[in-house]
Amino acid sequence: LEFFPDVSPRFASPFGRCSNPPKAVANRLAAAPRQLLYTHSGGNMPQYLVNRFAEEIANGETELALICGAELLRSTQNARKAGLKIDHNEDPGGEPTRIGDNRFGFSDEEARHELRAAIHFYPLLENAIRGGLKRDVASHMTAMGRLFERLAAAAKDNPLATRREGYSAERLATISDDNRWICFPYPRLMNSNAIIDQAAAVLMTSVGKAREWGIPQERWVFLHGCADGTDTWVVSERERLDASPAIRGCARIALDMAGKSVADVAAFDLYSCFPSAVEVAMKEIGIADDDPRPISVTGGLPFFGGPGNNYVTHSIAEMMNVVRKRPGSFGMVTANGNYLTKHSAGLYSTEPTKGPWRREDPKKFQTELDALPKQRVNTKPGGTG
């Protein structure tokens, strides 16, 4: 997964970079892989890669795939403050194959109005959600606090989480010195926390190879259903800002592929960079506000940590632990890139899949999404108001 410093100059490390990260990993493992892939930016990419490699493995095109990523922005920040001299430059040679969509997530017109970053787009979506619910600001702040209190509680019980205080809904919704406004209506503790040190990896293979390599069967987890889809790319052209046809469809396709319903899912890890991402996902998947099932198994990006493009690798790894503890149960992971734009979903269980593993061609669903109505943006509005 692409490192944050390679995504944005804002996060560039003063200590150098690796020119070919997947090859550097392969060298350390004494491996000679057929493919060396390095993603473009997108929080959807870990689940997207799982979906892609599952299909390749099922078709006999790939025997083993390693999906991995890491961020060390906390260590980098601390080392810079301490004036340390560190050399992270590495050139293992060659260039990786890039994968993903590297288009800007915003239009020229949006950029003209300073809409370029997640911390500007997601608050915009949040205010659309509040407007649709006809809530006043105070009531909506309380509702967001209650929602993210659930994530904070999950992080409190997770030894790998970076913020384990177990914040209350009131604390999360109250502006204070350590919970200042970032962009209305989000205070600091409702934002993804990118300044962390975290790494995760997922290994994928077939049942035959797992047996051949002696991987204990109690460790096996199967991908029962999956889907990928992209909403209208330009946020200002979307018909509604409080909806995501792509999330709705990804969940439906993944569940249909597995022959399951939403009621059959024991736990969810919904992409949680900001409250609006979780609220829209819950609505589109059909998870009620008072549903007691987990909506995050890690603690989410604000409390577990938001390691750039790699968060969902952590989601998947932790969901594997969850379903292993409850053999036969099902867990759903959703992933989101850009501004509630690029989506992937996966349904996991220790229960083996039945029959040949086949997924619907993602192009079919994407064609449906691309045919949805779009708003026309008036770049030169007039009027007296």
Q: Where are these predicted regions, by residue range?
A:
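Conserved catalytic cysteine-centered active-site region
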Residues: 10-64, 68, 72-107, 115, ...
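Glycine-rich anion/phosphate-binding loop at the beta-strand->alpha-helix junction
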Residues: 260, 271-278, 284-342, 346-353, ...
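Active-site-proximal alpha-helical scaffold in enzymes
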Residues: 41-71, 116-157, 202-209, 256-260, ...
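Accessory "access/gating" subregions that flank catalytic or transport cores
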Residues: 159-217, 256, 263, 267-283
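Metallocofactor- and cofactor-centric catalytic cores in central/energy metabolism, strongly enriched
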Residues: 2-20, 24, 80-82, 135-142, ...
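Phosphate/pyrophosphate-binding loops at sites that engage ATP/ADP/AMP, CoA/4′-phosphopantetheine
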Residues: 1, 29, 211, 251-264, ...
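Beta-strand segments within the central parallel beta-sheet cores of soluble alpha/beta enzyme folds
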Residues: 1-3, 35-41, 66-70, 139-146, ...
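Condensing-enzyme catalytic core mediating Claisen C-C bond formation in acyl metabolism
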Residues: 91-115, 123-150, 182-244, 317-318, ...
